[in-house]
Regions:
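N-terminal carbohydrate-binding accessory modules
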Residues: 2-6
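Active-site region of glycoside hydrolase catalytic domains
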Residues: 21-23, 31-423
């Protein structure tokens, strides 16, 4: 990290590693591990950005009350956050409570494709045996928002005066275009925004869910009490943005006629992906999507401080270290961030996904996003820098990035160096 020039690093704490049963005593070995990691980062001038929940809930709580579908999780999560603030908050300034709760809820409670793999037929894309896709995604996000606001309130009351840190939440985004220029597709495109982004952001900014969601989901949509609405509203100090690619949207309002509906049917729109999410196919370099999402946060949600926490190119795991497509992707998207900044977006930082090749949630080791290749056959798991690592290092150090190796790029991305803009 030091050789690359990183001045910040984002990682998640495993709740079950720190507090194995979800509540009760802290695992001292887990505590030592995270203290060592944080101390090593700080000693090398690297600022830690810590996520408290990333698809990882203690199994004991899942078994006891169903995890995020129970209100009991709010108190347990708040106590877990309290332990993290207490133990690490003297060195950690940026806390993300939950990573991408919108797609976490869809994969985990609607389609059954990601942990905890809850769903109900006919909406499962796996062999689901438990859950209810018609309302559990809404319930899980509802409890996540309440847990987030509870942890944020605790931090502001108990820790902020001494630690001077910030608490936020991250949201998965994608650029969207109507499939056709018809009014139906244009309206459907806005409805997709409500269901994916507004689902999280509207409660945080306005204290309630989007009207389109409440209308289409009806009584299956949870409601906030007056007190809860006030607690959730304004409970974020920043927003983490997760962004990889863009989609097309077409109207699918016929689904509203079904008696049995899930999130996708309530959304009444079809999302057309340009790539298979479960493949190693590369993403097109189309940074307009990220730029438009950043503009929408500015226009619709009060221009909150934003950290782009994930943005990167997917390649096959056995591809060359000369990852030209990743260099072009990062160059293009960082340029899109620059355009958003020029338009007044409140972007505070950018994190490329990912520093190393890691086990990916959807496709394991079949694909890679890392700047560094990890040799899984080496007992020491030796790291090798890819071309993108060299390019990114030059960018971070404010050096010319218009030519790396034999690649010629249209603009010099050193003009958007973190040291110049992300203060």
């Amino acid at each position: 990290m030091v050789e690359t020039g990183l001045d910040a690093y984002r990682f998640s704490i495993s709740w079950s590693r720190l507090i194995p049963n979800g509540r009760g005593p802290i695992n001292l070995k887990g505590l030592q591990y995270y203290n060592s990691l944080i101390n090593e980062l700080i000693s090398n001038g690297i600022q830690p950005h810590v996520t408290l929940h990333n698809y990882d809930l203690p199994q004991a709580l899942e078994d006891e009350y169903g995890g995020w579908i129970s209100r009991d999780v709010i108190e347990d999560f708040t106590n877990y956050a309290d332990a993290c603030f207490r133990e690490f908050g003297d060195r950690v300034l940026y806390w993300t409570t939950v990573n991408e709760p919108n797609v976490f809820a869809l994969g985990g409670y609607n389609q059954g494709s990601t942990p905890p793999r809850r769903c109900s037929p006919p909406f499962c894309i796996t062999n689901g045996t438990r859950g209810n896709s018609t309302y559990e995604p809404y319930l899980a996000v509802h409890h996540i928002l309440l847990a987030h606001s509870s942890a944020a309130r605790l931090y502001r009351i108990k820790y902020r005066d001494n630690q001077h840190g910030y608490v936020g939440i991250s949201v998965f985004t994608f650029g969207r275009l109507p499939q056709t220029n018809t009014e139906k597709d244009r309206v459907a495109n806005e409805r997709v925004h409500d269901f994916f982004i507004g689902w999280i952001m509207e409660p945080l900014v306005h204290g309630d869910y989007p009207i389109s969601m409440k209308t289409n989901a009806g009584t299956r949509m949870p409601t906030f009490t007056i007190r809860e609405s006030k607690l959730v509203k304004g409970s974020h100090d920043f927003i983490g943005v997760i962004h990889y690619n863009n989609v097309n949207v077409t109207d699918n309002s016929d689904t509203l006629n079904r008696k049995l509906r899930d999130f996708n049917a309530d959304m009444a729109a079809m999302i057309i992906y340009n790539q298979d999410l479960f493949s190693d196919e590369e993403f097109p370099v189309a940074p307009w999507g990220l730029q438009e999402e950043l503009d929408s946060f500015k226009l619709l949600y009060g221009n909150p401080p934003i950290f782009i926490y994930e943005n990167g190119q997917r390649t096959a795991s056995n591809s060359s270290l000369q990852d030209v497509s990743r260099v072009k992707y990062l160059h293009g998207y960082i340029g899109g961030v620059l355009n958003a900044l020029r338009n007044g977006s409140n972007v505070r930082g950018y994190f490329a996904w990912s520093f190393l090749d890691v086990l990916e949630l959807l496709d394991g080791y079949r694909s890679s996003y890392g700047l560094y290749y990890v040799d899984q056959d080496d007992p020491e798991l030796k790291r090798y820098p890819k071309l993108s690592a060299k390019w990114y290092s030059r960018f971070l150090r404010g050096r010319s990035t218009s030519i790396v190796g034999d690649i010629g790029l249209e603009e010099d991305s050193s003009l958007v160096s973190v040291s110049h803009l992300f203060q």
